[in-house]
């Protein structure tokens, strides 16, 4: 018969199993360090926004950050999660749904974020409920907009069954649940945060970039022209390796005159981002554009092997040449670098990927790129997680 100490040690190892009614081998929730995503660029500004949302989360169990693409919803949510994780007994864990295309895979993707399998005889949602139970946990659920019904059903079930769970979501629109509090993410402050972000990202590609009386005015005008949209500012700042702020502003003004003329009225934030992507894309070299278009076949994250597999084409450049061009796309903010569970990963932001997919379709090489993509997925070491989706045209 096991000693009392042994029984206590086993019980402590499975804090989510209570009263003898949960499956005895229900796994323990993973630690914070194993369930979080880390960006490799610094988080800039948003002090007031961070304080506002933190205050909301102290009182509400479901808060949704809304706003158009490129406004920084994901970065804000992850930063808030990092700041308040210590307030939750079992920390926080993140689930990015950007790559999930099947509503039935949402709960499975959440288990994947925890690094947990579905328990035998239980559905994915029942496994989640059993794992979380009455533990105090923060769930950051990112990119819910294309799976609103599925997310609503799962979130409702989790909140009803897990009384100490708090959920922070991001979406272009509200989830639509009773008790949900929506908070629209604003543009960056044009007097401080937007300029600070531009300078920070400019120094990633040009370490000697300096702000003085002259450049401060121009950079401020660039940020104003871009309506304080973070992604648009990052794309523009990445051009300081070859263009001066004055040249960047002139190029943006030319592009926005076309957009405003077509719209017939003021340019919306969505149009601001689209125009900035188009302008920055036009400044890429031919091989860089070709590689970007090919990378768009990845609906979610990928690694360097994947980039080489789909990017290399004997007719224009080979696999070893892909790395240099890939590095240029990272420097120019077209490819996002993330540290996920200690491993470097890459992805395209939604608006960039959608534009690149259009260009890939126009190029006439979509079928060939898709063939290389499928061949890569069949390699022995490639594992496609549930819900990773496919190519979405």
UniProtKB/Swiss-Prot annotation:
InterPro entries: P-loop_NTPase. ATP binds at residues 67-74. Gene3D superfamilies: P-loop containing nucleotide triphosphate hydrolases (3.40.50.300). It comes from the Bacteria. Keywords: ATP-binding, Nucleotide-binding. Coiled coil: none annotated. GO terms for molecular function: ATP binding. Was identified as a high-confidence drug target. This is Uncharacterized protein Rv0894. It comes from Mycobacterium tuberculosis (strain ATCC 25618 / H37Rv).
